Amino acid sequence: MVPAAITNIHEAFKEIKHMTIDTWQEECRLAARRAMKEVIEHRMHNGIDAFLEQMRDAGLPDRRNGSFSSHLVTEVGNLELRIPRTRTFSARSILQGFARRTASIERTILMCFLLGLSTRKVGPALLSILGEPVSPSTVSDIAKQLDQSVQAYHQRALSDHYEVLIVDGIVLRRKTGAGAQRRTMLVALGITPHGKKEIIDFRQVPGESKTAWEGFLNHLYQRGLQGDALKLVVVDGGNGLLAALDLVYGQVPLQRCWAHKTRNVLNHVKQGDQDKVKRALHRISHARTLREAQKAAQRFVLQWEGSYPKAVECLQKDLPELLSFLQVKTGLLPSVLRTTNAIERRFREVRRRSRPMGTFSDRTSMERILYAVFMHENLKQRTATPFLLLTQND
């Protein structure tokens, strides 16, 4: 694995420290418990050594006197620990001090991997951050289980209850043997009849070609998302995506994103007229009925065709698909249906949280970070799949 390109590790931890670890697969939590056990028991043994040295310096002889079992409840589960003791002292006080730090330690162990640190570099990073060593075998075990969690997410069965599907791509920079290169992540977000938004899946590809999109969408279809409940697919355009959607979800009405279309139209308008044109477009996109929107579009053409024929052409060529949201029967708000804003907000979160890391170190680090951010966002919507129930998403 290529070493991570992290500009400032402390800033990186600061950015992602609030991400939850509640959704990690049980095997990953087991590995984290093992690492916690090593860290805490090492600290207790060091504490006993320091105590015995102090006693010798004071002329008060003492010696080790075995250990006893104790439990510590943590975010990743119950730890069974061996508490070392001497004839006059036990390390229980050290354990009590650690009880106040367990949450941050657990997150630190997992976040080292989310940050894209190589297995070789996680141990030294943990030593500098925690002041405690974690064995290479434990580090390797955590990395393996974390990646298994990501793969389980990509392979889980999908239910077919979404009313709206939003699909888009995000471009990120990744290190390769030929230097930093741009890599595209294809992402699908579903919206339930109750308005809950969930990142369904993502896939890393070289670019947004028809073949790449078709493979991604077919994988969703084969896992259960066959589109029987879908009323709308929202996109920002792209010939490859449109061709793939026609093959996989051709029966579902297509909605073009009004935010993207507005920007594209304004590209053909002089700066001094952009506010007026934008207001005219707003009257179309925010019309309450299809008929009202069509009339507003007619007025737009009459008003601006002479001055900005390319702007008018840009609008007219996609107008039917821009107004699809006014023709579907759903309880969802129009603001949810007419743009890809829901998925764009999550893309901004990915960029914000990954900015301190610079360029992603490799494909694995990119997968881990997107998985962590998207699971965090899904949890806020109460749509994250518990990993013990990965056979079917909610």
Provide a role label for each language-model segment.
Residues 1-96:
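Short, conserved DNA-binding cores of transcription-related domains
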Residues 111-115:
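Short alpha-helical segment immediately N-terminal to, or the first helix within
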Residues 1-4, 12-20, 41, 45-49, ...:
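Acidic/histidine-rich catalytic cores and adjacent linkers
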Residues 64-65, 78-87, 93-104, 108, ...:
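RNase H-like nuclease fold core
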Residues 120-131:
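DNA-recognition alpha helix
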Residues 161, 272-289:
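A polyampholytic, Gly/Pro-enriched intrinsically disordered region
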